[in-house]
Amino acid sequence: LHLVLKYGTSIFVIENFGDKATEKLWNGERTRFPSGLIQRAIDKLNMLSSAHTLEDLRIPPSNRLEALKGKRVGQHSIRINDQWRLCFRWVGGNAHEVEITDCH
């Protein structure tokens, strides 16, 4: 499954999702996420889909890009807000297993 957005001559890809709720949000469908989270989460998904490199996600600094540890070793996350994270694996310049998680 390739989800592709085209802007000019560039193509940005989210390869796949780690859960159905995040995929539904990306596709504009109703989800279980709190209503106050939805627009900010969509903005972060768009940011992720537009990144050419992992380092692109360091801006803005409020993303707080970090490599995860423990059972999520190999994944990275950016902050949606104080409670929610967008977690993903970055492989070959693309985002894989993208999911929105409640870290509390």
Where are these regions (language model features)?
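Enriched for short, Lys/Arg-rich terminal
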Residues: 1-11, 69, 76-104
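Arg/Lys-rich, positively charged N-terminal/basic patches that mediate binding to nucleic acids
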Residues: 1-44
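Glycine-rich, flexible loop/turn motifs
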Residues: 13, 29, 53, 61-64, ...
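Amphipathic alpha-helical interface surfaces
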Residues: 18, 37, 41-44, 64, ...
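Short low-complexity stretches enriched in small and charged residues
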Residues: 44-45, 54
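Conserved phosphate-interacting/catalytic interface
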Residues: 48
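A short, surface-exposed loop/turn module that caps and links secondary-structure elements
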Residues: 52-76
